[in-house]
Amino acid sequence: MQKIIHVDMDCFYAAVEMRDFPELRGKPIAVGGRSDRRGVISTCNYEARQFGVRSAMASGYALKLCPDLILVPGRMQVYKEVSNQIRAVFERYTDLIEPLSLDEAYLDVTESSHCKGSATLMAEAIRAEILAETGLTASAGIAPVKFLAKIASDLNKPNGQYVIRPEMIEEFVKTLPLIKIPGVGKVTAKKLADLGLHTCSDIQAYPEPKLVERFGKFGSVLIERSKGIDKRAILPNRERKSVGVETTLAKDIHTLEQCRAVMPQLIQELGARVSRSAKDRAINKQVVKLKFEDFKQTTIEHRSDEISVNLFYQLLEQAMERQHERGIRLLGVSVGLASNSIASEQADVDSSQMDLGF
């Protein structure tokens, strides 16, 4: 049985800014974006979230929701330095560390002898050391598998932790909303809802062949996750090369106008995914993908250092030149990510949740 800890810093970029500039504390702030440009917010503090401000939101819209919102320019080098401090804390407990971004990581502590082998106590100690050494709070989730540890880290935020023990998994996943499963965004969640699928128990009762037929490989993943299964191991120094979103259409479409109508939701979801899992990474290209009725596919890409909506539409037009009157069954957008230096730089707990066995 694995013991996985998912550590997620609380409002990381915003928290660093409030630590370094105390006059910002207690005020709604957001990092990134500018009021005079179509910028996008990287993250915001809890005061801003009370007004509905969220990551990946256009800064102009965020200011409409919260007129007193303070927009703070990002300081990526500072965030990387703090991230290295946090990484050093992780390394005291395990070498099996899978960074997801500057502010979150998976830790496999299965073989660690710290804290009498208790992942629960190790998570508590890690959070305490991060607070003492950086002045920042972290939340943590503890579970036997990765995706449940990630979900658990969000259940007692901020500055808390939650444990899903092996014997809790079956009951926990029954009522788990599918939108909570990593990889299920708004687009996929709507498709599932259209089939009457809202929770993991709904997936468990749904015919597996139909789910795989509708969602392909991800259908198989959903079946496993609905049962609390996640066979993925921790990948030390993992570095993803791209982030993408695609949708398999209910019916084939044939015109550029029909494709353009699908794009806004895909681009919005892509922006949200980049903000969640790759906000510290530089973008190096944009890609549009089409899969036709004969299951052949084509991709068009172009170099870009930021997400440009106009460029996505230009790439779509170029891809459509390869249609040759075939129906289109899938449409996708993605961005390539430049190599990161994170890996190379190296640079209150509920007592009822404590269990020395886990």
Swiss-Prot record:
Tell me the keywords, alphabetical order: Cytoplasm, DNA damage, DNA repair, DNA replication, DNA-binding, DNA-directed DNA polymerase, Magnesium, Metal-binding, Mutator protein, Nucleotidyltransferase, Transferase
Q: Where is this site: Substrate discrimination?
A: Y13
Task: Give the main location.
Answer: cytoplasm
Q: Which GO terms describe its cellular component?
A: cytosol
GO:BP terms for this protein? DNA-templated DNA replication; error-prone translesion synthesis; SOS response
What general EC class does the enzyme of this chain belong to? transferase
Catalytic site positions: E104
Please list the residue ranges annotated as the UmuC domain.
4-185
Q: Which cysteines form disulfides?
A: none
EC assignment: the record states 2.7.7.7
Q: Where in the cell is it found?
A: Cytoplasm
**Binding of Mg(2+), residues:** D8, D103
GO MF term list = damaged DNA binding; DNA-directed DNA polymerase activity; magnesium ion binding
Binding note for cofactor:
Binds 2 magnesium ions per subunit.
Which PROSITE patterns does the record cross-reference, listed alphabetically? UMUC (PS50173)
Q: Which reaction does it catalyse?
A: DNA(n) + a 2'-deoxyribonucleoside 5'-triphosphate = DNA(n+1) + diphosphate
Does DNA-binding appear among the keywords? yes
Cofactor(s) the record lists = Mg(2+)
For this protein, the record's Pfam families field holds:
IMS (PF00817), IMS_C (PF11799), IMS_HHH_1 (PF21999)
Job description of the protein: Poorly processive, error-prone DNA polymerase involved in untargeted mutagenesis. Copies undamaged DNA at stalled replication forks, which arise in vivo from mismatched or misaligned primer ends. These misaligned primers can be extended by PolIV. Exhibits no 3'-5' exonuclease (proofreading) activity. May be involved in translesional synthesis, in conjunction with the beta clamp from PolIII.
> What HAMAP family does its record include?
DNApol_IV
Which family does the record claim for this protein? Belongs to the DNA polymerase type-Y family.
- Describe the subunit structure: Monomer.
Name of the featured protein: DNA polymerase IV
* Gene (UniProt): dinB
